[in-house]
Amino acid sequence: MAQRALVLHRWDYQETSLILDLFTEDKGRVRVVAKGAKRPKSPWRGLAQPFMPLLAEFQGRSDLKTLTLLEPQQTTQKLLLQGDKLYSGFYLNELIQRLVPTEAEAPELFESYLSALQNMTNSERVEPALRQFEWQLLQHLGAAFDWHYDADTGNVLSDSKWCYFIPDHGFVTQARDNQQRAYSVADIQKLAAWDVDDENRLRLLKYIMRDALAVYLGDKPLRSRELFRGTKRQ
């Protein structure tokens, strides 16, 4: 049965085929061989691209499935990502590839991913969509933290003026060392309500999400982030 899917990444395979890393609605991440997809007359040739809502079918018992159907999904808004939005889309794709295992069902995360791409298409501001997806990814990983209580004491953060973020733990009101970034509790309370209209507060959210995800990403740098920085230096 066909299911909604988007291409996260693609590789050349042999002379005429491609390997696609798909993010699908029902099966999560799946790697498939698109046989003959590079042939000039293949109906899949122009479809096997990131950020194109698709319907896909595949079969096989191994980790590498065989693609049997790939067609555009007519009922979903077309995704038009250019410039910084395109690199932001690559960033989301890389997060999924790095942190979501293959063949692990993730229907809610699929919807979050599609929603993030649509929001980036429709808005001039990409940061809110990125930060929201990062938070939903942390929830999917079981790494969500509380925005209202001190992770050490259980006391409400609002009893204090300043707090600090400890990755894989949460917010605390006592710093671990003098190198930690201090956050205004008032800002954290606004972020907890997803009040991201203020650019300075949105920047704080970026720091928090980056620190939270770094625990799971490890030391290997994100290729999409390096590519984006490279364009800014040109």
From Swiss-Prot:
Signal peptide: none annotated. Belongs to the RecO family. This is DNA repair protein RecO. GO terms for biological process: DNA recombination; double-strand break repair. One of its GO terms (cellular component) is bacterial nucleoid. Keywords: DNA damage, DNA recombination, DNA repair. HAMAP family: RecO. Involved in DNA repair and RecF pathway recombination. InterPro entries: ARFGAP/RecO, DNA_rep/recomb_RecO_N, NA-bd_OB-fold, RecO, RecO_C.
